[in-house]
A protein has these predicted regions:
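Residues lining hydrophobic/aromatic ligand-binding pockets adjacent to catalytic sites
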Residues: 1-310
């Protein structure tokens, strides 16, 4: 997921093309400070020589237009990406957290989000400008709702009703997918809402979620979006936090021994085969934090899926 990692030089990117144009920024975590090396936006053209679709994550943190309709920095960055893409290249965008999150961090605490499932913020501030910028290159939209502790969770039926009302009030689109990061909320009520609106179920290998196989079985074999596609995301090993996995995986240039959980590759391939058998398209997005280096994880999955090509 995402791109422009200097750790992928020699795998995805050619060193000579970017050597003098790698930017650096410092990321601060409780475990320490980490220097991130980032390639220029134009490197996306080389990314697409290896993979047909890119998941862009930065739209999760800020919308494309502000409340007054003015373009944000993300609007301009996304336009820059589009300039380096061909007509065959595709993009998945993450819907802004401001739309999907029940709570947001403010002043060191998590407080109720006043913009939660705001149809206008989504439609005017994100969806419309995304379609304007990307056109046919927009292959999918991922809504991600944060993990909710048991004492803060709404009943599954209430949460399903909230999403039902939201989807009733935004433009219908067959490219939408929803990732719910609370296992208890993966309910029949939710799956019925997704089916009603043609929204796909994201199968996510993430910290506090049950296994991919369990998520797949809960919905009766996954739920594709209206265009018939299924999304699988390998984000972190189960039971491991963002900080733990980031610290272990940085600088994302190699696999980390023991980090990729046993069975993850096999479960992923099992789901790929199930989706293919029903005649659907599967999009697989892999985070470096799932095992150290996303391209090498993708290679392992490809070899498991088609061993004769190794």
């Amino acid at each position: 997921m995402s791109d422009r990692y200097a750790g992928w030089i020699g795998q995805i990117y050619t060193r000579e093309r970017y050597a003098a144009r790698i930017s650096r920024r410092t990321k601060k975590l409780r475990s320490g400070q980490f220097v991130e090396e980032v390639l220029p936006v134009e490197s996306v053209a080389e990314y697409y020589t290896h993979f047909p679709v890119l998941e862009i994550d930065f739209t999760f943190y800020r919308s494309l237009l502000d409340r007054k309709g003015n373009p944000t920095q993300n609007y301009h960055v996304l336009r820059s990406y589009r300039q380096h893409m061909t007509e065959d290249d595709g993009v998945f965008l993450k819907v802004p957290q401001a739309v999907c999150a029940r709570k947001v961090r403010k002043g060191g605490a998590y407080v109720p989000n006043p913009d939660y499932l705001d149809a206008g913020l989504y439609t005017d501030g994100f969806f419309a400008p995304a379609c304007e910028i990307l056109g046919e290159a927009l292959h999918g939209l991922i809504f991600e709702q944060e993990y909710q502790r048991r004492d803060e969770q709404a009943p599954p039926e209430v949460m399903a009703e909230e999403w039902d009302r939201f989807f009733d009030n935004v433009p219908r689109d067959p490219r939408r997918h929803l990732e719910i990061r609370t296992g208890r909320l993966l309910s029949r009520a939710l799956f019925d809402v997704l089916g009603k609106h043609g929204v796909g179920q994201v199968l996510s290998h993430w910290t506090w979620l049950p296994s991919l196989r369990t998520q797949w079985e809960k919905s009766g074999g996954g739920l594709p979006s209206g265009d018939g596609s299924q999304v699988v995301r390998l984000v972190t090993p189960r039971g491991k936090t963002y900080e733990e996995t980031y610290t272990a995986a940085h600088p994302f240039d190699a696999m980390v021994e023991g980090m990729l959980h046993d069975g993850t590759v096999e479960e992923t391939v099992e789901i790929i085969r199930g989706v293919v058998q029903r005649g659907s398209r599967l999009y697989l997005f892999i985070n470096n934090r799932a095992g150290g280096n996303a391209p090498l994880i993708a290679q392992r999955i490809a070899r498991e899926f088609m061993p004769e090509t190794d």
